[in-house]
Amino acid sequence: MYTPRQSLYIRGSAGDPLPPVWAALDQKGTHLRRGQLVLVCAGPGTGKSAFVLAYALKSKVPTLYFSADSDAFTQLSRSVSILSGWSLERATRAVREQNIEDAVADSLDEIPIRFNYKASPSLDEIENALAAYDALYEDFPALIVVDNITNVRTDSSEGDDPFSGLESLMDYLHEMGRETGSCVVGLHHVTGPHNDGDKPIPLSGIKGQIGRVPEMILTLHRVSDGFGPDMLNVSTVKNRGGKSDPSGQDFASLEFVGDTMQINDFGH
């Protein structure tokens, strides 16, 4: 048990914000913080994986990325495109031919990110990867990404409800953030009516209604007018440390060029 003053000294890095990447999110008071659990939810093809990967690459914080949903070829192609501005077609061709230009390869080498590509990692495999990271770097990463949480094997036996295991997984990831001091980001799906991904998604749109535990929940929707870049809108529908709007109607807008995987502030 700790007094309030003792809590000040034992918190470690918990609560420290990770570097902002997009001013639009920063101005909304949406900050990823160490020691906390964040859920990023969107329909298929909206760009949630691109959004989180772009954050990890551009923030340049030490990251352990559990890429269950995408293989090494896909993630490397995306990373090359994000960092170089190349089209995804050019990036995938360069990766396939193992012919990445030196300047791009050097920029990849500068990013302190490590990937785990287990398609259905168990909790033991996640813990082993974290232990290996700690043994290698003598510290835990600032950011841990689980993409996505439905791929994690929880071996839950709580009846026939497929989301009972996700609720316990949220508790597990929450505790992971507390114990490691890492910001843990989980990617997740939304309910059927919101799968089109072209309208604001409220807190109630999260698949399985597992929003009890995370400190922050972001929902993404994407709007295209058929000309120029798309608009990737980020709604902060839950935020224990700041402003939120559970309806999803208040959002930060980012410019998203899908062909080159570029996500930027408008007018950057």
UniProtKB/Swiss-Prot annotation:
- What name does UniProt use for this protein? Gene 65 protein
Q: Give yes or no: UniProt keyword Magnesium.
A: no
What residue range is the signal peptide?
none
Listed A to Z, the keywords are: ATP-binding, Nucleotide-binding
**Is Transcription regulation a UniProt keyword of this protein?**
no
Domain of life assignment: Viruses
What is any Pfam family matched here?
DnaB_C
An individual GO BP term: DNA replication
Q: What Gene3D superfamilies would the database entry show?
A: P-loop containing nucleotide triphosphate hydrolases
* Species: Mycobacterium phage L5 (Mycobacteriophage L5)
> What SMART domains does the entry give?
AAA
Q: Which InterPro entries match?
A: AAA+_ATPase (IPR003593), DNA_helicase_DnaB-like_C (IPR007694), P-loop_NTPase (IPR027417)
